[in-house]
């Protein structure tokens, strides 16, 4: 039996219950013939959702004797913006709200929403997509809501992995093995990830202006959970605390000799088609926001998620929001406030165990005070790189610096430690705060009305801010690197250079060629990365085999790739 998807609508009480069911072409029975029970959708004190009478409830249920082990699922809006990060390997009956802040999504009735499914083909085998989902939907009572399956737009070379075995039938159950995160990543990133997708479109002509969307997934297979609201579980510890767990092995290494997972345009997860564009950006104004957003959004997980998945370098760009002047992260379009990014860092780096213990009764006990200090922050080294700050005035630079110092009080390492700083020297102040204010010199006007030839140094008296040009090398040419082949060719030369005792970034970044209009309008940065990134993984595997040093590996959509596994392996084995 194949997978089955069910969408249900809970209407007003004066309407008949409607059920829209997608059935398999090979079976005559639906997943569930019963109407959604009140137990499923009623308010519950323990629920993180509030479900009102007029809310739209959308359920996706899986029932099948599938041989398939792994799924990747994401929710998109009609502009193909990822609303939230990928959900990997759901446990049976787990529920999740697609929102970075763990709150309800307020549905825009003017938009369609899509769910994309990626399948892993373990056998390098495929079946016709018509066997994967039935495209005939039964709509009771002629309700105005409808589901449309956009299967005609699927690429002709689409291949999906087998979802069934003809030797088994509906009632034959399988025992699926429990797998570790390492094994999951190994399976997914052995270049078997199929980059094509099935798109299920659902649309609701709501009588209210605001609806809540809730997604529920279930499956006979109890899957290991890689993404969830709760990041404190056992299986996240190897990523969330990977430096702490391997402290004895890495503490005497210089930070610039570590392999560190990095995030490009790290906080662009908030960009969507309705986001404002940054004034003066180079993107032509005639290109609609629905297209610009697809290429401006480089991450789908928030900073806390990225930290939890082991990422330790963050590329952060700041500009003032129009009218309000509030400091925001940007990449052609405005994303989220800087304060949100800093709050996520604080949330992650603070050691909650410290705050659960009583204070020492003897303030003169230096040993006890040292133990408490050791417990204050996690021993996870983080590099923040504030750059592309050309939109900020002197006053806004000062505002940003004050916010960073205030939010990250006590966590910032002094730049006097230098670029040869060792991991153990950052045990109590784990954040290296790299700041680039070079753009200021272009706008400083002297008394004679001429631009200053001397750079304005806004961090001269700020020892907790490391100079970008003295601390970091991050070379890239956005005018040339339009294919993975171009980037890898450049990186192959870059790894052989002497980076003059600085941290250095290997930018595994693809830049779209503005001349390829068809590619721009029909694709997105996310889909492009999924198709090209296995080549980057192969490149770094070759570096590992030859023991070629590398430092920061920076990627788009970083939580989708196994760079943390790679970093841990190299840091503890070399």
From Swiss-Prot:
Output one GO BP term. Answer: lipid metabolic process
- Region Disordered, as annotated, extends over 1-42
Extract the PROSITE patterns matched here.
Answer: PIPLC_X_DOMAIN
Q: Which ranges are annotated Low complexity under compositional bias?
A: 21-34
Q: Which InterPro entries match?
A: PI-PLC_domain (IPR051057), PLC-like_Pdiesterase_TIM-brl (IPR017946)
Q: One MF term from GO for this chain? A: phosphoric diester hydrolase activity
Q: What sequence ranges are listed for the domain PI-PLC X-box?
A: 270-449
Family annotation (PANTHER family)? PTHR13593, SI:DKEY-266F7.9
Q: What is this protein called?
A: PI-PLC X domain-containing protein DDB_G0269228
Q: Which organism is it from?
A: Dictyostelium discoideum
């Amino acid at each position: 039996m194949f997978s089955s998807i069910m969408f249900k609508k809970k209407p007003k009480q004066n309407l008949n219950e409607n059920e829209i069911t997608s059935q398999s072409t090979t079976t005559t029975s639906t997943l569930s013939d019963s109407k959604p029970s009140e137990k499923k959708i009623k308010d519950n004190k323990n629920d993180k959702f509030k479900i009102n009478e007029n809310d739209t409830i959308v359920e996706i249920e899986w029932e099948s004797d599938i041989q398939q082990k792994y799924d990747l699922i994401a929710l998109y809006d009609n502009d193909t913006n990822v609303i939230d990060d990928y959900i990997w390997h759901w446990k049976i009956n787990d529920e999740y709200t697609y929102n970075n802040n763990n709150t309800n999504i307020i549905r825009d009735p003017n938009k369609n929403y899509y769910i994309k499914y990626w399948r892993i083909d373990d056998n390098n085998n495929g079946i016709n997509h018509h066997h994967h989902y039935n495209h005939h939907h039964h709509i009771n009572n002629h309700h105005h809501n409808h589901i449309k399956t956009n299967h005609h737009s699927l690429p002709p070379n689409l291949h999906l992995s087998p979802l069934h075995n003809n030797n088994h039938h509906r009632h034959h159950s399988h025992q699926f093995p429990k797998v570790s995160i390492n094994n999951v990543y190994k399976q997914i990133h052995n270049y078997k990830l199929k980059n094509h997708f099935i798109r299920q479109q659902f649309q609701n002509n709501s009588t209210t202006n605001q609806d809540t969307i809730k997604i529920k997934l279930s499956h006979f297979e109890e899957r290991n959970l890689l993404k969830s609201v709760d990041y404190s579980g056992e299986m996240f510890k190897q990523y969330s605390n990977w430096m702490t767990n391997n402290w004895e092995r890495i503490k005497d290494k210089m930070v610039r000799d570590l392999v560190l997972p990095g995030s490009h345009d790290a906080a662009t997860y908030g960009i969507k088609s309705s986001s404002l564009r940054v004034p003066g950006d180079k993107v032509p104004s005639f290109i609609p926001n629905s297209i610009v957003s697809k290429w401006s959004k480089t991450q789908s997980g928030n900073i806390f998620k990225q930290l939890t998945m082991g990422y330790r370098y963050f590329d952060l760009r700041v500009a003032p929001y129009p009218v309000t002047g509030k400091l925001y992260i940007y990449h052609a379009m405005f994303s989220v406030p800087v304060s949100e990014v800093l709050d996520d860092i604080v949330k992650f780096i603070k050691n909650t165990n410290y705050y659960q213990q009583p204070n020492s009764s003897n303030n003169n006990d230096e040993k006890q005070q040292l133990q408490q200090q050791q417990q204050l922050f996690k021993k996870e080294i983080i590099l923040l790189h504030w750059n592309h700050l050309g939109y900020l005035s002197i006053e806004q630079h000062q505002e940003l610096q004050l916010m960073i110092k205030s939010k990250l009080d006590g966590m910032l390492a002094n730049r006097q430690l230098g670029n040869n700083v060792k991991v153990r020297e950052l045990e109590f102040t784990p954040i290296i705060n790299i700041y680039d204010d070079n753009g200021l010199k272009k706008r400083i006007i002297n008394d004679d009305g001429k631009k200053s030839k001397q750079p304005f140094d806004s961090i001269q008296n700020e020892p907790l801010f490391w100079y970008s040009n003295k601390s970091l090398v991050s070379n890239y040419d956005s005018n040339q690197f339009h294919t993975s082949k171009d980037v890898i060719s450049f990186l192959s030369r870059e790894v052989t250079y002497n980076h003059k005792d600085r941290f250095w970034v290997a930018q595994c970044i693809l830049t779209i060629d503005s001349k390829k209009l068809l590619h721009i309008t029909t694709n997105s940065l996310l889909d492009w990365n999924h198709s090209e990134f296995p080549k980057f993984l192969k490149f770094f595997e070759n570096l590992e085999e030859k023991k070629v040093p590398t430092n920061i590996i920076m990627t788009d959509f970083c939580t989708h790739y196994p760079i943390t596994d790679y970093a841990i392996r190299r840091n503890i084995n070399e």
